Amino acid sequence: MTDQQTNGAAAEDNSPQFSLQRIYVRDLSFEAPKSPQIFRQTWEPSVALDLNTKQKALEGDFHEVVLTLSVTVKNGDEVAFIAEVQQAGIFLIANLDAPSMSHTLGAFCPNILFPYARETLDSLVTRGSFPALMLSPVNFDALYAQEMQRMQEAGEVPTVQ
């Protein structure tokens, strides 16, 4: 009976594991270079969004994933505001093969972080007295697939740090 329990525990140790440990804001910035004059102008914004993800292996099976959202909003030719958030998470990820680990860190984890980053950015913008910034959902699986395709065409090998 003891051997069966031991063997069962060993089998469980090799099963894939995923657990969110913590979500936090790593960095946050907001600039409104043309305030207060910008508030008196007719509001006709154009929005440019840049997003980026980075991963870093921590001790053991822990990984940090950082999703950076940078937004530049112009009103006409003038920059109304620039806002950036680095939303980070610590994830316990174990017993995945290399392709699954790469996908988890490059698409699954950023997908978890995005709603937090979007809400933080929206709150920051409204606290700057600008209209709410309603960012559309992002398909991180599609972005990940595009990046893998680009790397394959360039002859690069994806790496997990």
Swiss-Prot record:
GO process terms (BP): protein folding; protein tetramerization; protein transport
Keywords, sorted A to Z: Chaperone, Cytoplasm, Protein transport, Translocation, Transport
Signal sequence bounds: none
Main subcellular localisation: cytoplasm
GO MF terms held by the record: unfolded protein binding
InterPro entries assigned: SecB (IPR003708), SecB-like_sf (IPR035958)
Protein's job: One of the proteins required for the normal export of preproteins out of the cell cytoplasm. It is a molecular chaperone that binds to a subset of precursor proteins, maintaining them in a translocation-competent state. It also specifically binds to its receptor SecA.
Family, similarity comment: Belongs to the SecB family.
Protein name, UniProt field: Protein-export protein SecB
Organism: Pseudomonas putida (strain GB-1)
Name of the coding gene: secB
